[in-house]
């Protein structure tokens, strides 16, 4: 929400993946934003050709996407598409809001980089959180906002001066100890095992040719 409020104004249009996270469109509506859906495929991610047409026509004020561990597709955008997305943001000077809430739960080794890794001019705003990897109740996240860092910080300060100090201190100590990385490795193994079991059940119970 902070990222959208920073780079858009009521009446602006934003480009979203289709399908996308179910609550993103209502959020945009509450902010007075119009949404334009961009076709998104599990194998290739958001259509860069379709997005470039929108950008060339100057129809959108921002792009919102989930390149790694997409919700609801569960897939990640190919590396070349990420490079192209970062290049388009720089070329057309349009902010890309990268939702990385699930990115640390990737099963690929090594982990796939964020679009932000290819951002040469600060147009990509990377948003992440510990609510999906540690505890939903923490409600603690972070942003790497590039050229918009100051505006985001000012907006956050006006909205809420700080997060709960005890939670932040405990989380900081957990990160510094190295235990977080161990926790992530266990979590990835657990989820990967659950997916394998689910696929096995689908293979056993569904008609031949069913893909999961």
Description of each model-found segment:
Residues 16, 97-98:
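Hydrophobic residues in beta-strands of the RecA-like P-loop NTPase core, especially within AAA+ ATPase
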Residues 26, 85-87, 96, 196-197, ...:
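A generic "structured core" feature
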Residues 36, 97, 125-127:
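Hydrophobic/aromatic beta-strand patches that form the interior of the parallel beta-sheet core
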Residues 120-189:
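Conserved core segment of the aminotransferase class I/II
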């Amino acid at each position: 929400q902070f990222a959208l409020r920073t780079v858009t104004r009521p009446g602006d249009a934003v480009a979203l993946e289709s399908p996308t996270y179910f609550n993103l469109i209502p959020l945009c509506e509450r902010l007075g934003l119009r949404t334009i859906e961009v076709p998104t495929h599990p194998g290739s991610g958001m259509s860069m050709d379709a997005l470039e047409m929108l950008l060339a026509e100057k129809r959108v004020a921002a792009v919102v996407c989930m390149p790694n561990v997409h919700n609801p597709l569960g897939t990640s955008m190919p590396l070349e598409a990420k490079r192209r997305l970062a290049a388009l943001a720089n070329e057309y000077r349009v902010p890309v809001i990268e939702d990385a809430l699930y990115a640390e739960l990737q099963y690929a080794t090594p982990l796939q980089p964020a679009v932000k890794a290819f951002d040469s001019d600060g147009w990509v705003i990377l948003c992440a959180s510990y609510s999906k990897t540690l505890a939903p109740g923490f409600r603690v996240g972070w942003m790497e906002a590039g050229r918009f860092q100051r505006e985001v910080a000012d907006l956050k300060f006006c909205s809420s001066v700080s997060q709960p100090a005890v939670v932040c201190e405990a989380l900081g100590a957990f990160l510094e100890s190295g235990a977080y990385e161990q926790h992530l490795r266990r979590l990835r193994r657990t989820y990967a095992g659950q997916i394998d079991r689910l696929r096995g059940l689908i293979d056993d119970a569904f008609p031949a040719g069913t893909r999961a």
